[in-house]
């Protein structure tokens, strides 16, 4: 039987698939084995294997490599795309075949790295990472532009021109903006570190101040403890002996057994050690307060993290030493401590101490005892009385008079700052859920001016400086009204003669002008009345004729035009069309929005 020959292209396709699989595996492994700072390790074994695969490829194999890189880029986020961009940069500068294939068709590369088509291929992730990727890509393209191998290449120039004309890429100023943002963040970090340093310095000065006080108090506490309970653990200095006793005599001395029921020392307060005990308790209480203050300082320093760790640890060590001293002082039992002496009031300074005899004291005590006996007897009698008698007494009693003040509240609280109780209005009192009143809705607030202002009256008769109007009326008489400045009918009061004419020329001209204006107003009113009567007779009356103002007329006219159904339909159609275009522009590639 004849064997069928396999076609040659099958073996070629298998080799391409194998190389593609190897490149993809090396690429994935290479991306997984990145360093923590986001930079590629060009000395790693996966990178060397990937470099060998690219170097061994021909033109078709190189196209396959670019396809694998672009496919991986499309499925990766912006941080991984920055790493793949470094691979593109490395292969572009090392292998001419890779460079030629990439420059022949850079459209997909530009879409994935520069977001030249944000509707079709938007950058994934946050906007911050996208801007960083764009800046990195612009830096790479600018470095390619300066290379000798592609400096005079028309394709490279077209690529740069395309990026400059694209409105989605700021090719000229993109790096400058990122640099300005980086400088701004650096300034903020420096300012933050300076504030932290100042805080640490403040806490350090506070700690040293507390430390100086605590050392003084510790010395005082230790001294008083040694005075109250002498320490027998320290070795006493050797005292030279004057006796002629020999060591054999010392060895022959008798031994004693001492039984101590409780090792906790007890101190009974007496007149001899009263001052020492008081100083001991005061020093211990002050040290407890210092320990609490140091604890608060440590909590605040822990919020600063690394800059305040050293000082916080120093404070903790010092605080533990003070705490041990306070715990040691707590072991002392003080029996019958004297209560603290009451401070003398300032009002007692005006009194003089007078010696009272024992007879006077006995008389006062006897009088107090008699008063107590009388009160107890009255209470027992009231209990035994009948309830009817008690009711009769209640009726006979006069009502208690309410105390009144013979002057107003303004004098009672004169010069004092008083805040009256505010009664909030609850706007939601009819709702089934209670909520607090809104701000600004407070009622029942009394006027504060009544406590700071007062009207004073003067005794005597005020001089009558009122003038007579003397303006001529329609009846021919002169106006007899009196007032200080103006007459309610004729206006300003001026000097007039016996016939009612103003004496001054200016006042006479002003009065003539006022009369002319009044005549014009009356003529205008008569004209309006005549026109209205004529219109009412000739003009057809509307069905619902309502008198409206000018602003209401404008509102009605605009309402008639804007709220027309055809106008609303036309405007809503335009708004829907613009909204649909905006959605299609931003989310056209996502079917879930339509």
Swiss-Prot record:
Pfam families: DUF2043 (PF09740), UVSSA_N (PF20867). One of its GO terms (cellular component) is chromosome. Residues 170-198, 503-540 form a coiled coil. One of its GO terms (molecular function) is RNA polymerase II complex binding. Keywords: Chromosome, Coiled coil, DNA damage, DNA repair, Metal-binding, Zinc, Zinc-finger. PROSITE patterns: ZF_UVSSA. Disulfide bonds: none annotated. Its main location: nucleus. It is found in: Chromosome. GO terms for biological process: response to UV; transcription-coupled nucleotide-excision repair. Residues 533-558 are annotated as: Disordered. A zinc finger (UVSSA-type) spans 466-493. Residues 544-558 have a biased composition (Basic and acidic residues). It comes from the Eukaryota. InterPro entries: UVSSA, UVSSA_C, UVSSA_N_a-solenoid_rpt. Residues 24-170 are annotated as: VHS-like. Zn(2+) binds at residues 469, 479, 487, 490. Belongs to the UVSSA family. Factor involved in transcription-coupled nucleotide excision repair (TC-NER) in response to UV damage. TC-NER allows RNA polymerase II-blocking lesions to be rapidly removed from the transcribed strand of active genes. This is UV-stimulated scaffold protein A homolog. It comes from Caenorhabditis elegans.
């Amino acid at each position: 039987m004849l064997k069928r020959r396999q076609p040659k292209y099958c073996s070629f396709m298998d080799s391409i698939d194998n190389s593609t699989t190897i490149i993809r595996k090396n690429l994935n492994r290479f991306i997984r084995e990145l360093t923590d700072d986001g930079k590629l390790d060009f000395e790693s074994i996966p990178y060397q294997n990937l470099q060998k695969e690219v170097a061994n490829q021909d033109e078709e194999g190189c196209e396959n490599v670019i396809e694998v890189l672009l496919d991986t880029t499309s499925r990766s986020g912006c941080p991984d795309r920055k790493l793949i961009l470094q691979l593109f940069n490395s292969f572009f500068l090392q292998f001419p075949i890779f460079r030629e294939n990439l420059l022949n068709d850079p459209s997909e590369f530009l879409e994935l790295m520069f977001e030249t088509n944000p509707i079709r291929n938007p950058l994934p992730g946050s906007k911050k990472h996208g801007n960083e990727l764009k800046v990195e890509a612009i830096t790479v393209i600018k470095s390619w532009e300066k290379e000798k191998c592609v400096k005079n290449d028309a394709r490279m120039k077209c690529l740069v021109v395309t990026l400059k004309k694209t409105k989605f890429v700021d090719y000229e100023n993109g790096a400058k903006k990122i640099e300005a943002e980086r400088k701004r963040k650096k300034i903020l970090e420096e300012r933050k570190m300076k504030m932290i340093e100042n805080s640490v310095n403040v806490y350090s000065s506070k700690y040293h101040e507390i430390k100086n006080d605590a050392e003084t108090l510790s010395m005082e506490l230790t001294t008083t403890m040694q005075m109250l309970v002498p320490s027998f653990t320290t070795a006493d200095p050797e005292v030279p002996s004057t006796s002629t006793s020999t060591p054999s005599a010392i060895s022959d001395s008798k031994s004693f057994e001492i039984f101590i029921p409780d090792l906790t020392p007890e101190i009974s307060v007496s007149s001899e050690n009263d001052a020492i005990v008081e100083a001991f308790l005061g020093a211990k209480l002050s040290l407890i307060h210092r320990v609490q203050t140091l604890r608060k300082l440590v909590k605040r320093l822990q919020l600063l993290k690394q800059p305040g760790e050293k000082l916080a640890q120093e404070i903790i060590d010092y605080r533990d030493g003070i705490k041990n001293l306070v715990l040691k002082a707590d072991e002392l039992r003080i029996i019958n401590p004297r209560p603290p002496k009451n401070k003398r009031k300032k009002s007692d300074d005006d009194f003089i101490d007078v010696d009272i005899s024992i007879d006077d004291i006995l008389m006062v005590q006897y009088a107090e005892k008699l008063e107590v006996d009388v009160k107890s007897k009255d209470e027992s009698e009231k209990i035994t009385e009948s309830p009817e008698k008690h009711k009769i007494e209640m009726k006979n009693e006069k009502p208690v008079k309410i105390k009144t003040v013979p002057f107003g509240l303004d004098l009672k609280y004169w010069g004092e700052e008083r805040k009256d109780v505010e009664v909030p209005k609850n706007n939601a009192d009819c709702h089934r859920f209670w909520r607090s009143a809104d701000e600004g809705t407070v009622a029942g607030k009394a006027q504060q001016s009544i406590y700071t202002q007062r009207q004073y009256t003067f005794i005597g008769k005020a001089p009558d400086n009122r003038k007579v109007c003397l303006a001529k009326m329609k009846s021919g008489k002169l106006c007899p009204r009196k007032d200080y400045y103006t007459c309610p009918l004729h206006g300003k009061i001026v000097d007039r003669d016996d016939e009612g004419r103003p004496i001054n020329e200016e006042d006479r001209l002003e009065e003539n002008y006022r009369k002319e204006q009044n005549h014009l107003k009356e003529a205008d009113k008569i004209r309006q009345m005549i026109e209205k009567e004529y219109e009412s007779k000739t003009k057809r009356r509307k069905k619902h004729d309502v008198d409206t103002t000018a602003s209401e007329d404008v509102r009605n006219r605009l309402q008639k035009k804007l709220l027309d159904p055809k106008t609303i339909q036309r405007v809503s159609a335009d708004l829907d069309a613009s909204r649909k275009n905006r959605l299609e522009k931003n989310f056209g590639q996502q079917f879930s929005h339509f």
